[in-house]
Amino acid sequence: MDIPQELKEQIEKISSIQHKKIIEESQVISKKYRENDGKGKRLVEKESEAIAYAISRMPATYCAVYSVLAQSLKKYDQDIKTVLDIGAGTGAATLAVTNLIDTEKVICVGREMEMRKVGKQLMENNLPNVEWKSFDLNKDEIPEKADLVITSYVINELTKEDRQKAIEKMWDATNGMLVVIEPGTPEGFRHILEARKILLEKKANIIAPCSHNGKCPINPEKDWCSFYTRVARTKIQKQAKKGELGYEDEKFSYIVFSKTPINQSDAVILRHPQIGSGHVKVKLCTQNGIEERTYSKKDKELYKRVRKLDAGDTL
């Protein structure tokens, strides 16, 4: 997946000043985010660090959010006119949302002033009416409710106690849909399971990726549920990450909740289908647990359909 051309141009524009320094900062920022998960520390304090964050993380975050929303909107038929992006960073999630949904009002809230400043710069041409507000998820009350509340790569920065409070707070601010996205790691999946447990107790309805509201059949001590999107790298990303490949794979775990009941699917594909000679094998999460099924040419249209599906798709 490629990010929108206008975002690519804006990132290149803001990174054109002090080019070498920005590349160095992007490497520092990546290290900070890897090593400070769950410690609640401020990770971005300078404008150059915020720009470096936009270079190193925005394309992948945009693509992950876009993938999650595209999948979730297939099952959700309520109107979404207002959006609240919590821990918005430099606005990647908001850009993904507005490329999929015709919104009337979008509010981006975040703790780091420099991140908000860079986010405004990136959106000044295409989304000038987005509101940006200072907000600390641990300390502040959420400013207002929205039809869609989204938080991406945020709760992994909180302690366990703060995560529970944050999840409950975000659910209270949700009129319709709540999206929570985390890194596609064992730890990220455990955070998703925490959110799942907390909100099912509050009678939330799962839109995606789960096919049911029952107990998750995956043992987090042995495995984890994650998906990925292939992200086209920009020229400056290649320089910042010292990579030659024209792409990177962004792995993510997620869960999406609805205030209203959802027509859930029978099964969700957990891994990319294994296509063999005349057959295809798929690993599925169903209401009865994890299943592995094989479809052959004898299954005709179903066989043809499954061959075209990917992890996260419903069956």
Language-model segments: which ranges?
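N-terminal auxiliary segments of SAM/dcSAM-dependent transferases
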Residues: 1-40
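Class I SAM-dependent methyltransferase Rossmann-like catalytic core
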Residues: 41, 45-67
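Conserved SAM-binding loop of SAM-dependent methyltransferases across substrates and taxa
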Residues: 90-102
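Conserved SAM/SAH-binding beta-strand->alpha-helix loop
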Residues: 112
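A short SAM/SAH-binding and catalytic strip from SAM-dependent methyltransferases
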Residues: 147-161
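C-terminal lobe and adjacent flexible extensions of AdoMet/dcAdoMet transferase-like proteins
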Residues: 239-315
